[in-house]
């Protein structure tokens, strides 16, 4: 009898554990700024919806490959950069969203609302690809993408590898340098890129590599996403950021619901939460992400280092990530022929 009582008690306790266990929302994201995101994004959502957020962290490629191998199982939401978002959609891993659960989309910039169509998730932040150069080393100001081909920059610049988020913009700029569309005439774009090669000391795959090259005096200029600027500026105070006269390239990060998620509605509520004015402002103030919510107002000091303001965002060159993805294999091969020699 005593054994039976203990047995029933154990069953009851295990059932209580199931009954009172919090619902979990599994989010695939980068591992950066974890403490700040916990404080301003995850914890408030957990409290409001009585849910536990579980993170899967890593870079774009690693996390997307993991999602492909598992066919999306076990993950509810995924943060990805533009080209990887397109890849995930084409692989059939992204669920179509119910926009009625995302009322805050009406408060964000147009370019962020439906970057891959109304069926898929919005961008929650916007960055830009521009040029950084050291004014102590380069006296003739850099103002244009075309300046990357100047003969007095031989061996002085670094550009992002083709496989990075910003990499494809180098091909687009090479095409523009000779007045062609890189998608329509890739042979001319890569011929133009080959002409720039003499100026490129090396390519980089990690932002820390670029910052280190500046710090060690190996390079005097580089193409980068704007978030790298603060790191370079810390090492090289004479470094400046340039939004080229033709316009910087827009780079967005998206949040999407993974197809097959058993928590789809909750996941959509999380996306809406991230787009809210409060969360967008809180995250901007601690320099984690640039806001896309148009209601977020920042002072000049508060917006320093961020991509902020309708005039700046309106000046961007957009990137057709669908075309980038469809040309990716050929572009990588052509790139490697140039830079592996």
Predicted features, each with a name:
Residues 300-341:
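Extracellular/periplasmic bilobal clamshell ligand-binding domains
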Residues 127, 191-196, 204, 235-259:
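Periplasmic-binding protein-like
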Residues 95-104, 121, 149, 237-249, ...:
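Short beta-strand->loop
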Residues 84-87, 215-216, 221-238:
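A ligand-binding cleft/hinge motif common to bilobed small-molecule-binding domains
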Residues 22-87:
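Early extracytoplasmic/lumenal segment of secretory-pathway proteins
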Residues 258-316:
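Mature extracytoplasmic/periplasmic domains
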Residues 32-38, 74-75, 79-201, 205-215:
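Extracytoplasmic ligand-binding site segments that recognize negatively charged/polar headgroups
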Residues 130-137, 173-178, 251-263, 271, ...:
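A bilobed periplasmic-binding-protein/Venus flytrap-type ligand-binding module shared by bacterial periplasmic
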